[in-house]
Design a protein with these regions (language model features):
Chain A
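Glycine/proline-enriched, intrinsically flexible loops and inter-domain linkers
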Residues: 2-792
């Protein structure tokens, strides 16, 4: 450190930082040396603020500002101004994501975009809280710890709105597991190592906490070699009348849970930066250490405090630690706060005040408690063997005051803390053109189908799913794996209440490969996929969550792809009448290998009025009819089939929302009338893969005729069989339900394309009537299972 | 004894997580069930007010050493005498998954000569290694000694889920033969892993999901009032918890797990 910029103030490690006298260059030096991640514009704002105060800031103050203004905590890009295509977008979040919800104004939304998790109504008395987090950066540096604390963090988000966590879901993205070691740049861990660590970390946290992991996906892409993608989601249940959010001045700030240590210092600034060769060495301490049992105890205590109505507000300690939890709570209730850092229990002595204030040590929650309830609250924590301490109180002046050993170490006005300079960025769109492949149609598609089933994005992930407890709590009614062959169900269904048949369907959609061509249609496809997965099991009244993993928004081209994805989010959320209720972005996913492929995860949460009507994807009975619902187009750009052939292509699948909505409604109606015996969505690998999965999951063969498939502009067997057009389903219907089912679909693209056969094989007749696929169920299943049979 | 007079205590400590569904299963059958933190049981000192004590599944104290070992030592230190009195009074103890591990670590199971001061068996790391969550089949081996399965016909095949990473039941190699003989002679063998037709797994994965010696999934003590098993009957209680209910033409009312809860309740109703 350059001496002139820092003045040691106390007998304990507290520094005054000479911001007032610093040049622009020195301001940047300070930002870099303290690791606060502020740019010049922001440092100038800080300088101006302290000039008005007539004093230099302490390191505690600078760190607090740095944490609060980080991309991770403040979402500068989503809230900033973007110049794009001649227009100025003031906040992507307000213009697209929140606007979709505001335009739809669903009455069943209880609390949206307000806290760490969105809450929707489940029934008259209960609400469902849900949140999906990204934990990419920590998982890249320390796969096990990064993934485990990702799960721990999202569970606390749900606890942070007084909800009892009832299920987890995890969507992961890795580089190819056979990636060449020679090509691995220094500081980047091999995908296989990352894969094993992340999967173990997720399993360990969810299993240990006794929360079933019920839904997820694993996706492979070259760009994930340097930027692993880890989405951790959690769903919780709460009695709405126990929801408390009314903290006021004089309420006590109670910190409960694990002790505070040096782990997770600067997690948020790290998460808002580009990964480099030095990330391991510089950022290892930014990854927290997980202790799920601590959180399990904490959960029990918090649910009791909720039920006894003893606290007035709650939030979790995540990114930014105390600094952001205290500041955000104070801001939310229009008050200020006084915090005494020496009351924070430490794992070991020797932490500087600023470290205590920004540490992201895990398993901690912050409660606001009216003084008269303090003893009762502490008693509940004690009875669960959880440490809890009053560390300060909220005050009526909107100012944050932090003390350590009797000395004031920070004093900042709350409004200033939440008014960082608006970021203005420029986006520039360049449409991508890939080579449109021309290759001859293979005569026999059996081998192609077998290869597709074995391709990493389609192959069975059973070896991973079985390491997650998906049954604990005993409420998982539709499991992630279906039948003896462990076929992939489209969504998980929970029956959360003992005295009700109402169910909750959880599904997801993600199509990074389409985003290589156009992020607009990628986002549209992800929304369609998440919804149709939900509809396939019987879900409706669907709410969506958006999770963005993108590269650096400072690159105009990357930013334009983000804008286009957000536009699609608005367009299709409104078209499908499915509001966004929560979301999260992770930007700056850049590594020495380049920018991450834009990856939008859409999570869908649907309601099922009566779970006894839920439909699984396995075929049930020989002789039943197989229908395809929805039209198949010449849209193989970004498909798994093209990937197999070594192409990306340009014809990205579109979403025709008007038609799609009618199809979704008809399927829902057919399920409600009990006409659907099995239903499976068509996604990666198209009709061919979906049919194979349904067949081997049910243990019966199928006979299908491609001539009957409703198509547009398609005359090749391989394209009909493997096109990934959206909004399509394969449905099993019994002969006697045929008429009623067809009546529901009148006017839509649908066709009876074959039957369930006694012979245990999938037999597909091509457009000219000859056999193009003839494969035994055993072979299909073996190929599908082989790829990951022994990876974990 | 009347059904509604029966009192069940489902114990928990930090890391226990299958308590609610276990309590639910008992309550569904009309008995009183209560979830009790072990601290609270120590404070109240009222163990003998209960007829059935359950150690449910979970990761007690994080299972940071061998699964179940910490809770076992804790419970013997704080409640050892009361527990022995409870057992000697012929009250009933059930250990599910982590609870089974606790009972083995605490010396209650197999308990050839009463409570053993050291574990006589172990639930070791699975082979193949790793956590495994799946539905398996069990064959009922008991000839009537075990109060938790006496209503289940001998030889009946049940289907329940397992979810654990340390469930491989083992004896010390040099005592394997002798102990197995004692288990059989005493009628302590309760469940063995088998396929859907009742053929024993003979150690084959995944029919035997953890590599257990002699395909052992559950055992009781020589008196038949302490029973532990790795699979989770509370997750196979209702029809809709079964993995293939969407294939069933005729909805069954319940899953096979119910048989275990029902057995102990009927035992109490009929014999006390």
């Amino acid at each position: 450190m350059s001496i002139s910029l820092y003045i040691r103030r106390k007998t304990f490690p507290l520094f005054e930082v000479n911001v007032l006298g610093a040049s622009d260059q020195q301001l940047l030096e300070i930002s870099r040396e303290l690791g606060v991640g502020l740019n010049l514009q922001e440092m100038n704002r800080v300088q101006e603020f302290f000039r008005r105060k007539g004093r230099n800031p302490t390191d505690v103050e600078l760190q607090t500002i740095g944490q609060t203004w980080s991309e991770h905590c403040f979402h500068k890009t989503f809230k900033g101004v973007i110049k794009f295509d001649g227009e100025e977008i003031d906040s992507l979040f307000r213009t697209y994501i929140a606007k979709a919800t505001n335009d739809l104004k669903p009455r069943w939304c209880f609390s949206i975009f307000e806290d760490n998790a969105g809450i929707i109504r489940f029934d008259k008395s209960y609400g469902v809280a849900v949140k999906v987090e990204t934990h990419n950066h920590p998982s890249a540096v320390e796969p096990f710890g990064g993934a485990a604390t990702g799960v721990g963090g999202v569970i606390r988000d749900v606890l942070g709105v007084w909800a009892d966590p009832i299920a987890c879901m995890d969507v992961l993205g890795f580089g190819p597991l056979n990636f060449d070691y020679e090509k691995l740049p220094p500081g980047v861990k091999h995908p296989k190592y990352v894969y094993m660590g992340v999967v173990a970390g997720i399993g360990s946290y969810g299993n240990n906490m006794g929360i079933p992991t019920v839904n997820g996906a694993i996706y492979f892409d070259e760009s994930y070699v340097g930027n692993v993608v880890v989405y951790c989601g959690c769903v919780g249940l709460l009695p709405l009348k126990k929801f408390r959010r009314n903290a006021k001045p004089e309420d006590i700030i109670v910190l409960a849970g694990g002790r505070t240590g040096c782990d997770g210092i600067h997690g948020v600034t790290f998460a808002s930066a580009v990964l480099t060769e030095k990330s391991e060495e510089v950022s290892r301490p930014a990854v927290q250490i997980a202790n799920p049992i601590e959180e399990e105890k904490l959960k029990r205590a918090i649910i009791r405090i909720r039920d006894l109505e003893l606290a007035s507000a709650i939030t979790d300690l995540g990114g930014g630690g105390l600094s952001s939890a205290v500041g955000e709570t104070a801001k939310r209730f229009g008050c200020g706060a006084v915090v005494e850092l020496d009351k924070v229990p430490l794992k070991y002595p020797g932490l500087a005040p600023w470290e205590i204030y920004v540490s992201e040590s895990q398993e901690r929650m912050l409660l606001a408690v009216p003084p008269e309830n303090l003893q009762k609250v502490l008693e509940v924590f004690r009875s669960e063997d959880v440490e809890a301490n009053a560390i300060g109180k909220y005050i009526s002046d909107e100012v944050l005051k932090v003390y350590y050993q009797g000395e004031k170490v920070a004093e900042i006005e709350i409004p200033f803390l939440f008014e960082p300079p608006k970021v203005v960025r420029t986006a520039e769109y360049k449409s991508k053109v890939f080579e449109e492949p021309t290759f001859e149609e293979p005569k026999n598609l059996t081998d192609t189908l077998l290869q597709l089933l074995a391709s990493p994005n389609i192959a069975s992930k059973e070896s991973v799913v079985r390491t997650y407890d998906h049954e604990v709590k005993g409420n998982t009614l539709l499991k992630p794996l279906q039948g003896e062959s462990a076929g992939p169900n489209d969504a998980a269904v929970l029956k959360p209440l003992d005295d009700s048949w109402k169910g909750l369907a959880i599904s997801c959609g993600m199509n990074p490969n389409y985003g290589k061509i156009d992020t607009y249609w990628m986002a549209a496809s992800a929304i369609d996929e998440a919804i149709r997965n939900n509809v396939a099991v019987g879900g409706r009244r669907i709410a969506l969550l958006d999770n963005f993993t993108w590269g650096s928004p400072e690159k105009p081209e990357v930013l334009s792809s983000l804008v286009r994805a957000c536009k699609a989010c608005y367009d299709f959320a409104t078209a499908f009448k499915t509001p966004f209720i929560s979301g999260k972005d992770s930007l700056y996913n850049e590594s020495p290998l380049g920018t991450v492929t834009p990856t939008l995860l859409i999570t869908a949460l649907g309601i099922i009025p009566d779970v006894r009507l839920v439909v699984s994807m396995d075929v049930k009975e020989v002789g039943d009819l197989i229908y395809v619902v929805g039209r198949t187009y010449n849209e193989l750009g970004g498909s798994e089939y093209y990937r197999l052939k070594g192409f990306v292509g340009n014809t990205v699948p579109k979403v025709r929302a008007k038609e799609a909505l009618k199809i979704f409604k008809a399927i829902t109606r057919a399920i409600d009338l009990g006409l659907v015996k099995a239903c499976h969505d068509l996604s990666e690998g198209g009709l061919g893969v979906a049919a194979a999965e349904m067949a081997f999951a049910g243990g019966y063969g199928m006979e299908l005729y491609l001539q009957k498939v409703p198509v547009e502009n398609l005359n090749r067997n391989d394209f009909v069989l493997f096109s990934e057009s959206n909004s399509r389903f394969l449905v099993e219907v019994s002969e006697k339900a045929k008429e009623e089912f067809e009546a529901l679909l009148r006017g839509l693209a649908y066709s009876e394309i074959g039957k369930i056969a006694k012979t245990p094989s999938l037999c597909v007749y091509g457009l000219s009537g000859d056999v193009v696929v003839d494969a035994s169920l055993n072979d299909l299943l073996a190929c599908w299972k082989r790829t990951f049979s022994s990876e974990v | 004894m009347k059904r509604e007079e029966i009192k069940v205590s489902v114990l928990r400590v930090g890391g226990t997580n299958c308590d609610a569904e276990t309590k639910r299963a008992f309550e569904e059958l009309g008995v009183q069930a209560e979830i009790l933190h072990a601290n609270e049981l120590v404070r109240r000192g009222n163990l003998l007010e209960y007829h059935v004590l359950v150690f449910p599944g979970g990761f007690s104290y994080g299972d940071y050493v061998r699964a179940g070992a910490i809770w076992a030592k804790w419970i013997m230190a704080k409640l050892g005498e009361e527990l022995k009195a409870f057992v000697n009074e012929n009250r009933f103890t059930l250990g599910i998954c982590n609870g089974f591990q606790v009972l083995v670590e605490a010396g209650f199971l197999p308990g050839f000569d009463g409570v053993s001061p050291y574990p006589e068996a172990v639930l070791a790391t699975n082979f193949p290694p790793g956590y495994n969550c799946r539905w398996i089949h069990l064959k009922h081996e008991n000839r009537g000694k075990c109060a938790f399965t006496w209503k289940i016909p001998h030889g009946k095949v049940l289907r329940l889920p397992v979810a654990h990473s340390e469930g491989r039941f083992m004896f010390a190699k040099e005592k394997e033969k002798e102990f197995l003989k004692r288990l059989c002679d005493n009628d302590q063998l309760v469940f063995r892993y088998c396929d859907r037709n009742g053929e024993y797994a003979e150690g084959r994965f995944p029919t035997n999901p953890n590599g257990s010696f002699y395909d052992i999934a559950g055992i009781c003590n020589p008196e038949g009032n302490i029973f532990g098993l790795m699979p989770h009957p509370e997750r196979a209680f209702y029809w809709w918890q079964q993995p293939d209910w969407t294939r069933q033409k005729q909805m069954l009312q319940y899953g096979d797990g119910k048989l275990i809860f029902e057995s102990i309740i009927e035992y109490l109703v009929e014999k006390f």
